[in-house]
């Protein structure tokens, strides 16, 4: 039982790490209301993601 709980804790920490990496461009590139979406795409691709979009003036990597 303790092993199962330990595995679940480790898995949740790994998932949290992936989510944090996915948003690695949020602080680097704030999106303007109009345009500048290419900067977000480039930032996410340089960080190793497939691309990104602007949501609520923040860059979200996919």
From Swiss-Prot:
Cysteine pairings via disulfide bonds: 25-43, 31-54, 40-59, 44-61
Gene Ontology cellular-component annotations: extracellular region
Keywords: Disulfide bond, Ion channel impairing toxin, Knottin, Neurotoxin, Potassium channel impairing toxin, Secreted, Signal, Toxin, Voltage-gated potassium channel impairing toxin
Annotated site (Key residue on the interacting surface with the channel): 55
Signal peptide range: 1-20
Domain commentary: The presence of a 'disulfide through disulfide knot' structurally defines this protein as a knottin. Has the CSalpha/beta fold, which comprises one or two short alpha helices connected to anti-parallel beta-sheets stabilized by three or four disulfide bonds.
Family under the similarity heading: Belongs to the ergtoxin family. Gamma-KTx 1 subfamily.
Name by which UniProt lists this protein: Potassium channel toxin gamma-KTx 1.1
